Swiss-Prot record:
It holds the Pfam family GTP_cyclohydroI. GO terms for cellular component: cytoplasm. Homomer. The keyword Zinc applies. It comes from the Bacteria. Its EC number is 3.5.4.16. This is GTP cyclohydrolase 1. Pathway: Cofactor biosynthesis; 7,8-dihydroneopterin triphosphate biosynthesis; 7,8-dihydroneopterin triphosphate from GTP: step 1/1. Belongs to the GTP cyclohydrolase I family. The keyword Transport does not apply. Keywords: GTP-binding, Hydrolase, Metal-binding, Nucleotide-binding, One-carbon metabolism, Zinc.
Length: 184
């Protein structure tokens, strides 16, 4: 990541909105923003393979559900945050991931400029591709600051998105069971 370019761009934005980049409260802002972007965009170019490839053998194929995984990310359209909770269900095929690995999967894909629909897809596809799940179902609930702070200005509005892969695509009863276990 080119932090010098980020700092220069932030200085230009500060000046473009009519502020003084040398004002005491703004002098270190370009460097702070560059460091922040390094952190919140640390998922760029990464996948969840390293997390989901560390799995454990299991003899049954009962559904695994992990819900209320908090995340935050940046909307790629306005570069404003959106945040919320991800709920994951999957059907193992002989292997299960450690529970923290599901949260890490959400984290990897949320640490970049993102849209909610793609975040759903990337998490579900990672479970299928890297864990070898028989099915994956991901529900994400999020509030978007681009809708709360600007535009229609409707704070508190939740957007829900879902994606189903494998067994969840064809089995409505399985999806319904996942919804119930997720409390949705």
């Amino acid at each position: 990541m080119d932090t010098q370019k980020i700092e220069a761009a932030v200085k230009m934005i500060i000046e473009a909105v009519g502020e003084n980049v040398n004002r005491e409260g703004l002098q270190e802002t370009p460097a702070r923003v560059a460091r922040m972007y390094q952190e919140i965009f640390s998922g760029l170019g990464q996948t969840a393979e390293e997390h989901l490839s560390k799995s454990f053998e299991i003899i049954d194929d009962n559904m695994v559900v992990e819900k209320d995984i908090f995340f935050h990310t940046m909307c790629e359209h306005h570069f404003l945050p959106f945040y919320g909770r991800a709920h994951i269900a999957y059907i193992p095929d002989g292997r299960v991931a450690g529970l923290s690995k599901l949260a890490r999967t959400v984290e990897v894909y949320s640490k970049k400029p993102q849209i909610q629909e793609r975040l759903n897809i990337e998490v579900a596809d990672a479970l299928m591709d890297y864990l070898g799940a028989k099915g994956a179902f991901v529900v994400i609930e999020a509030e978007h600051m681009c809708m709360s702070m600007r535009g229609v200005r409707k704070p508190g509005t939740a957007t829900l998105t879902t994606v189903a892969r494998g067994l969840f695509e064809t089995d409505k009863d399985l999806r319904d069971q996942a919804y119930r276990l997720m409390g949705l």
